[in-house]
């Protein structure tokens, strides 16, 4: 009898064991399915669970078993318990996703711990408005205000906060004050000030969503530290939670939460927040192992997008450094004031602007451009037209001895063997000018700063500058010299030794004025030395970039020992305190090369603009250097031509045997008359 009773007991125990094992297996599979469905919302839920279980096993001395690989989700989206819970909550409240978890009155009561402050309400409203811009694009304070005013869900307390904080200036001041406060306190927004119709406005350039979330009420952020209850419909499915561990049934039946509360990324509760029972630091309260499970469902955390990356400590440090390196409003004002002062300093005065206007070409610009294709034939071929452009063109010179296959001559119109050179040469095509007829009469090219009567006629003296008496010439405002430096090359003219240059009587020519000294090659350092010996201080340097007949930079020059020279230098020295026009011209001249050692004619117009109506002297000149208002000295000039009576008299007294032209000079120019007393004083001295 006892045997039958024992057998029946064993059978009952075996059946109970089978049922329990099946139930455990069913619940285990259900848990795995639930984790699989939650993994798309919380990607790191499995590692967080394993970490919690591993920590629990270290305290309970039980072996740790990692979570097995999750199966594919088997539940359709519309039947998923989480989706079902969200749908029921939305039907219950009848609001959007933001009001699904927290009542609006409760959100106001928890807003930053200061629900009665209008600033806190306005900051929360502005932060909520900015967070809704996904993806974020820059906006201004006026747009934010319009969005807040047009919000149908705005409560009277929020509208009153806008009015109270804005005061007499209106709600726009409240929005801008809140933005500035948020930028200064935690750097959650990046702002820039601008003006609209004379009124200052604020532009929001960028936002930090992590920091903006802190402006919202705690319950709205999804990271509460209190065990708040979220009311849910009674139709939410309940499950039996075991008292022996995760996935094992127990004797007590409690409503099973769909997810645990706390941080949405880790799923952990805050540490040590239960009234009784020991909890692990920073982990979820394990039900059935330590303490008691809560007798209510836990609140749902806000979903975290799977593509959102957690900010690293290095990124936070960079944000802090960027915030610290930003200029304050006071620094920006000081910088703006400094820029305005610099602008005022560098802005030309009315006198300087009027002086520069005097030297502009009268009648407009008369510059004529050269065609980039050189000849009319190439111009028509490249443009695909039967008519060439209206720019200046060249014409190829093809002689009987020309070999077109050799290409263009390197020296072009400066070639010294034009009659026998086999390379192609060019000349300016004048057919366009002849067909167009005579040009419209325009005013002279020379600027209207000196008349012909003021400048006077050109004067020159053929002499040996090394032994000529410079003291009879008087003093000059401008001296230009192009010495025949000894550069150890074969030149078509004589040169001067270095010591002869150093001992020239140049100091007697000026007391207050400028000197322009042309140098080349090794003579650059010698020229600087001569300026210092003559009593000048070098202040500038002019560069002449040489171009050929086709307006291209020359590549085969006749000067240069190591490299072909495509430029020349002119040193500028100053003595005394002359009156000059500053900042009129530049220090670069681009001009065509002509005869050997001939300098560009642009120099004469430039020097006239720098010191108009001053006496000007050119040393080592040739006949092509003779210009109105200039006195030229050199050994390649045609005799002596002097117009100024005082200068003629002094020259005849010193050199009676030399004839002076013209025999009866015309009336002296006004410029020579004005400078005559100065010249006599220098001779007397």
UniProtKB/Swiss-Prot annotation:
Summary of the knockout phenotype: Embryonic lethality: arrest at the globular stage of embryo development. Arrested seeds are deficient in mRNAs containing N6-methyladenosine (m6A).
Main location: nucleus
Keyword Phosphoprotein: yes
Catalyzed chemical reaction(s): an adenosine in mRNA + S-adenosyl-L-methionine = an N(6)-methyladenosine in mRNA + S-adenosyl-L-homocysteine + H(+)
GO biological process, one term: RNA methylation
Region (Disordered): 657-685
GO annotations of cellular component type: chloroplast; nuclear speck; nucleus
Region spans: Positively charged region required for RNA-binding: 552-565
Pfam families the record matches: MT-A70
Phosphoserine found at: 664
Function text: Catalytic subunit of the N6-methyltransferase complex, a multiprotein complex that mediates N6-methyladenosine (m6A) methylation at the 5'-[AG]GAC-3' consensus sites of some mRNAs. Associates with MTB, FIP37, VIR and HAKAI to form the m6A writer complex which is essential for adenosine methylation at specific mRNA sequences. N6-methyladenosine (m6A) plays a role in mRNA stability, processing, translation efficiency and editing.
Subunit structure of this chain's protein: Interacts with FIP37. Interacts with MTB. Associates with MTB, FIP37, VIR and HAKAI to form the m6A writer complex which is essential for adenosine methylation at specific mRNA sequences.
Family label: Belongs to the MT-A70-like family.
Protein name (database record): N(6)-adenosine-methyltransferase MT-A70-like
């Amino acid at each position: 009898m006892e045997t039958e009773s024992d057998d029946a007991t064993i059978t009952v125990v075996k059946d109970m064991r089978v049922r329990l094992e099946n139930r455990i297996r069913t619940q285990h599979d259900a848990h795995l399915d639930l984790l699989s469905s939650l993994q798309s919302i919380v990607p790191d839920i499995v590692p967080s669970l394993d970490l919690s279980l591993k920590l629990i096993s270290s305290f309970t001395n039980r072996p740790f078993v990692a979570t097995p690989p999750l199966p594919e989700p088997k539940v359709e989206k519309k039947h998923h318990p989480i989706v079902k819970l969200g749908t029921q909550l939305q039907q219950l409240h009848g609001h959007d996703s933001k009001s699904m978890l927290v009542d609006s009155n409760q959100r106001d009561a928890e807003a930053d711990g200061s629900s009665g402050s209008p600033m806190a309400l306005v900051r929360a409203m502005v932060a909520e408005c900015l967070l809704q811009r996904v993806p974020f694009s820059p906006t201004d304070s006026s747009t934010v205000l319009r969005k807040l005013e047009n919000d149908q869900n705005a409560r009277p307390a929020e509208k009153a906060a806008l009015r109270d904080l804005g005061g007499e200036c209106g709600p726009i001041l409240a929005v801008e004050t809140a933005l500035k406060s948020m930028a200064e306190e935690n750097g959650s927004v990046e702002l820039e000030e601008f003006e609209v119709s004379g009124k200052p406005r604020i532009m929001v350039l960028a936002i930090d969503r992590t920091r903006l979330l802190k402006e919202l009420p705690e319950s709205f952020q999804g990271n509460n530290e209190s065990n708040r209850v979220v009311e849910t419909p009674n139709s939410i499915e309940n499950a039996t939670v075991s008292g022996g561990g995760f996935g094992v049934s127990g004797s007590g039946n409690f409503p099973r939460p769909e997810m645990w509360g706390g941080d949405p990324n880790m799923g952990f509760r805050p540490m040590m927040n239960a009234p009784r029972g020991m909890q692990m630091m920073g982990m979820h309260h394990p039900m059935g192992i330590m303490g008691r499970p809560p007798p209510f469902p836990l609140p749902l955390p806000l979903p975290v997008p799977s593509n959102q990356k957690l900010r690293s400590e290095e990124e936070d440090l960079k944000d802090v450094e960027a915030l610290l390196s930003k200029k304050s409003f006071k620094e920006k004002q000081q910088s703006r004031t400094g820029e305005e002062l610099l602008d005022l300093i560098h802005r030309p005065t009315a006198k300087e602007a009027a002086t520069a206007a005097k030297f502009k070409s009268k009648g407009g610009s008369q510059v004529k451009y050269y065609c980039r294709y050189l000849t009319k034939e190439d111009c028509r071929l490249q443009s695909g037209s039967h008519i060439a452009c209206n720019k200046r063109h060249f014409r190829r010179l093809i002689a009987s001895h020309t070999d077109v296959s050799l290409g263009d001559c390197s020296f072009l119109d400066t070639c010294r063997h034009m009659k026998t050179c086999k390379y192609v040469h060019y000349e300016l095509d004048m057919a366009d000018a002849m067909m167009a007829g005579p040009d419209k009469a325009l005013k002279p090219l020379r600027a209207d700063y000196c008349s012909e009567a003021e400048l006077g006629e050109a004067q020159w003296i053929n002499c040996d500058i090394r032994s000529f008496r410079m003291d009879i010439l008087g003093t000059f405002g401008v001296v230009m010299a192009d010495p025949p430096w000894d550069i150890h090359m074969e030149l078509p003219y004589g040169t001067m030794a270095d010591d002869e240059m150093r001992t020239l009587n140049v100091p007697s020519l000026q007391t207050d004025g400028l000197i322009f000294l042309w140098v080349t090659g090794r003579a650059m350092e010698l020229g600087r030395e001569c300026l210092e010996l003559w009593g000048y201080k070098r202040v500038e340097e002019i560069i002449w970039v040489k171009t050929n007949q086709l307006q291209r930079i020359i590549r085969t020059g006749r000067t240069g020992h190591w490299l072909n020279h495509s430029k020349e230098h002119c040193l500028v020295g100053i003595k005394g305190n002359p009156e000059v026009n500053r900042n009129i011209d530049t220090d670069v001249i681009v001009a065509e090369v002509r005869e050997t050692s001939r300098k560009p004619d642009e120099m004469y117009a430039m020097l006239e603009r720098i010191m108009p109506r001053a006496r000007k002297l050119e040393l080592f000149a040739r006949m092509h250097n003779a210009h109105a208002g200039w006195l030229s000295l050199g050994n390649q000039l045609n005799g002596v031509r002097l117009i100024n009576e005082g200068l003629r008299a002094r020259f005849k007294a010193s050199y009676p045997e030399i004839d002076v032209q013209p025999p009866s000079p015309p009336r002296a120019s006004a410029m020579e008359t004005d400078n005559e007393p100065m010249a006599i004083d220098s001779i007397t001295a």
